[in-house]
């Protein structure tokens, strides 16, 4: 998401009788001077906007630690976790990632939450992948059909 503008404090706008044409200037960082010459700074006339939400995904890829800087601080990272660590050699051969590698990248990038998916069919019980990832990055979820997450 793009950063949003701050929210106008309607009670202050009404109390100070600020005309509508001045609202956009105030949202953009300006203040207001009353007819009596009293200046009200921007911070008194607005409340901060919610920070923008962010989502990133890494799928069909090997472990790329250099991505950490690009992914830094995202709210939700989807990362493939095709293999368990026991199959790390197979992951490298096929240019895929392990659950631990996905979690390591999430930790390096200081993301808020990690969603792992793109599992190999060899795992009937994907909880082994979840446990491996959570051992490194606790806030990890398994992707499931129909899963809905609020950011």
Language-model-detected regions and their locations in the chain:
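Binuclear metal-ion centers of metallo-dependent hydrolases, dominated by the metallo-beta-lactamase
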Residues: 63-151
């Amino acid at each position: 998401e793009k950063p949003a503008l701050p929210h106008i404090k309607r009670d202050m706008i009404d109390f100070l009788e600020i005309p509508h044409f001045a609202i956009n200037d105030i949202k953009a960082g300006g203040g207001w001077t009353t007819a009596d010459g009293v200046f009200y700074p921007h911070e008194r006339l607005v409340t901060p906007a919610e920070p923008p939400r962010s989502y990133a995904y890494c799928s069909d890829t090997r472990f790329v630690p250099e991505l950490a800087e690009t992914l830094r601080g995202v709210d939700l990272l989807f990362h493939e976790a095709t293999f368990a660590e026991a199959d790390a050699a197979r992951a490298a051969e096929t240019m895929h990632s392990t659950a631990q590698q996905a979690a390591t990248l999430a930790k390096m990038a200081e993301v808020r939450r990690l969603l792992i998916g793109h599992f190999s069919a060899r795992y009937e019980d994907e909880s082994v992948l979840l446990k491996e990832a959570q051992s490194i990055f606790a806030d990890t979820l398994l992707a499931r059909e129909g899963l809905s997450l609020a950011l």
